[in-house]
């Protein structure tokens, strides 16, 4: 072999090695860039389309089994179910199997089930609390079957009782439910959902008293009215900061009307006896600063836009804010 041939071959091998290293590094670099850009993922709460799923007068009806397809149609890959939409199907394996099949077919993850109408978790009577816990077990089982990570419950008690007594009772019910959730590897998350549960300090007190690793909070950006009749509202930014240490795998991005003139990332609720403006950018920054990087779920309840348009507008706001972080 001549010196020229040896040099050429060495040069080729060296160049090939360098090129190979560059090409191998590119996917990793792109992956890191994508991971850095996306501080959180976006999901869709079924309640955003509640008028259609519950077949309200004047609303074009939707079947619960269509939910995953709708989420995918607007570019969303995570869904949060509402038990009201399939209330009598909690133990129907064939039906749940069809839900699971459709979600998988759309490439959509089933994240949680929001549970209402199953009793008061903080009922003053021992028997009533026990019954409420029992009533939620079928939803824990359904969530497990669907591949969800959580069920969302309400920390309701008797409003006539003292603050501390309500907290004690709610914590007792939640602890019991947390024990059941732990057997299934699931979370039980409480939403700030009106009354005392919308008071940040009260709900944190409940979490401390419940004292179970499987019990946490699902913060809702818009549910901070402690008394709508009196227009009494807990500071949503303070409340969100107080809730974040207790958040597991879900945050609810409640949204109302967009493009109202308040600002690009402001959403406003102007229903009767309600006057609320939410700074989405500020709220999202609180969530991300707390180290949360999971799904943030769109829950649209506005009046100005159609349900689908409201979902799309909320998604756009979340994506634009995410790109800025």
Predicted feature locations:
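Acidic/histidine-rich catalytic cores of soluble enzymes
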Residues: 78-79, 174-285
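Short, acidic/polar
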Residues: 57-71, 130-141, 233-240, 280
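N-terminal secretory signal peptides and thylakoid transit peptides that target proteins
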Residues: 2-20
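C-terminal segment of N-terminal export signals and the immediately downstream linker at the start
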Residues: 27-56
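Acidic-and-aromatic substrate-binding clefts and catalytic sites of carbohydrate-active enzymes
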Residues: 51-52, 59, 82-95, 120-124, ...
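Catalytic domains of carbohydrate-active enzymes, especially glycoside hydrolases
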Residues: 63-82, 147
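Active-site acidic/histidine proton-transfer and metal-coordination neighborhood
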Residues: 16-27, 36, 68, 96, ...
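Hydrophobic faces of well-ordered beta-strands that scaffold small-molecule active sites
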Residues: 40-46, 79-81, 110-115, 151-153, ...
């Amino acid at each position: 072999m001549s010196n020229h041939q040896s040099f050429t071959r060495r040069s080729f091998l060296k160049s090939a090695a360098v090129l190979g290293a560059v090409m191998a590094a590119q996917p990793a670099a792109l992956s890191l860039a994508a991971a850095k850009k996306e501080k959180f993922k976006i999901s869709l709460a079924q309640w955003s389309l509640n008028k259609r799923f519950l077949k309200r007068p004047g609303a074009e009806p939707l079947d619960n089994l269509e939910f995953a397809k709708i989420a995918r149609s607007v570019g969303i890959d995570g869904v949060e179910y509402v038990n009201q939409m399939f209330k009598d199907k909690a133990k129907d394996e064939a039906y749940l199997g069809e839900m699971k099949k459709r979600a998988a077919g759309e490439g959509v993850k089933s994240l949680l089930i929001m549970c209402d109408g199953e009793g008061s978790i903080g009922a003053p009577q021992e028997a009533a609390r026990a019954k409420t816990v029992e009533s939620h077990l079928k939803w824990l089982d359904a969530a497990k079957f669907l591949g969800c990570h959580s069920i969302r419950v309400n920390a309701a008690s008797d409003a006539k009782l003292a603050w501390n007594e309500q907290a004690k009772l709610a914590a007792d019910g939640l602890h019991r439910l947390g024990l059941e959730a732990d057997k299934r590897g699931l979370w039980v998350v409480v939403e700030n959902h009106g009354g005392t549960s919308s008071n940040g300090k009260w709900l944190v007190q409940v979490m401390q008293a419940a004292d179970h690793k499987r019990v946490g909070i699902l913060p809702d950006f818009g549910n901070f009215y402690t008394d709508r009749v009196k227009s009494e509202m807990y500071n949503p930014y303070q409340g969100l900061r107080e809730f974040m240490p207790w958040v597991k795998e879900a945050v609810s991005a409640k949204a109302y009307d967009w493009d109202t003139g308040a600002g690009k990332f402001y959403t406003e609720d102007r229903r009767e006896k309600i006057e609320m403006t939410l700074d989405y950018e500020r709220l999202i920054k609180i969530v991300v600063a707390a180290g949360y990087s999971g799904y943030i779920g769109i829950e649209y309840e506005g009046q100005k836009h159609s349900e689908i348009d409201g979902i799309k507008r909320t998604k756009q706001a979340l994506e634009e804010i995410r790109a800025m972080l």
